[in-house]
């Protein structure tokens, strides 16, 4: 699991370093804890919300929950090609049954937003985090080779 987490964090950092004009990736890196006695509910919720995001948010590039062996710690990785796609996700989430169930099952321990989050996205994330880390230095070979195809995902 450590290697998988390292790979995922490396990939997200790698994607965040993109400097492709059409791609300005935003990453949500979220450490969660399952609320006591909510293990089975949390797993059921994760399955349902993942299917919902996959069906309703085609621009979401990555949406993955990673459970620890003890199942009380969870890492949620979300990757969006741009601010607009991240905002679509937040607009679908805020005030919905998904948000209600999320807070019934999880406590947010750490939430970092990686990438160039605009003011509108930052405002939508205010209830959850104030930890925004913009791109400073980096490169991305994936963006150089696949950036145009990724940006065409609708």
How should these model regions be labeled?
Residues 10-74, 81-91, 104-154:
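Short S/T/G/P-rich N-terminal loop/turn motif that feeds into the first structured element of a domain
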Residues 97-102:
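Amphipathic alpha-helical coiled-coil segments
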Residues 1-4:
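Positively charged n-region of N-terminal signal peptides that target proteins for export
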Residues 6-8:
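Short helix-onset patch at the extreme N-terminus, typifying the N->h transition
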């Amino acid at each position: 699991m450590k290697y998988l987490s390292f790979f995922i964090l490396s990939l997200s950092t790698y994607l965040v370093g993109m400097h492709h004009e059409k791609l300005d990736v935003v990453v949500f890196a979220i450490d969660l804890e399952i609320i006591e006695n909510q293990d089975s509910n949390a797993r059921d919720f994760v399955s349902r919300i993942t299917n919902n995001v996959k069906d309703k948010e085609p621009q979401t590039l990555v949406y993955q929950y990673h459970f620890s062996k003890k199942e009380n710690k969870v890492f949620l990785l979300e990757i969006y090609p741009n601010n607009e796609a991240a905002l679509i996700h937040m607009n679908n989430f805020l005030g919905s049954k998904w948000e209600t169930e999320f807070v019934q099952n999880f406590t947010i321990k750490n939430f970092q937003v990686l990438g160039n989050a605009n003011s509108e996205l930052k405002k939508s994330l205010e209830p959850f985090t104030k930890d925004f880390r913009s791109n400073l230095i980096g490169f991305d070979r994936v963006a150089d080779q696949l950036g145009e195809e990724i940006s065409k995902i609708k």
